[in-house]
Amino acid sequence: MIERGTLTFRDAGPDDAEWIAGLLSDEGYPAGATDIRRRLERYVERECPVRVAEAGGERVGFVACQVIPRFEHNDQVVRVMALVVDPGVRGRGVGGALMAEAEKIADGIDAAFLEVTAGHHRPGARRLFEAAGYDASLTTYLRKRR
């Protein structure tokens, strides 16, 4: 277990692009460093945080959040769009710490709620989110592929 107090968090930057691309590619979401740099720029422009977790100066995971203003209410929602932990440290508390970081982001903007999308093909991720109190029985939107 990596102690939560030993993890530090910082905003992702262009120097993280190749590392993030590698993690995403390993998870079945192929991306190059150039793609990730563009995505990071887009997230910064929209004030959507991407945070990197480090332990002992080494990057161990990241979480990318979208801040979404709701039209039907005068508030915002935070959605976790991506959360990936380095395979070498999985099962040691990093994912939970990254979710806690996402919750701090949501608290910081007084978000109405925090939501996360977790595919059925990622049972470990679903268990992480459910253990953190997320309700897996909700279906909040429908999707049509374009």
Give the predicted meaning of each segment:
Residues V85, G91-K104, R127, A131:
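Conserved acetyl-CoA-binding loop-helix of GNAT-fold acetyltransferases
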Residues D16-W19, A97-L98, G124:
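Charged catalytic carboxylate motif
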Residues G5-L7, D11-E18, G22-D75, M81, ...:
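Acetyl-CoA-dependent GNAT
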Residues G96, H120-L138, R143-K144:
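Conserved active-site alpha-helix within GNAT-family acetyltransferase domains
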Residues M99, A106-A118:
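Conserved GNAT acetyl-CoA-binding A-motif
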Residues I68, M81, D86, R90, ...:
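Residue-level recognition of the GNAT/N-acetyltransferase active site
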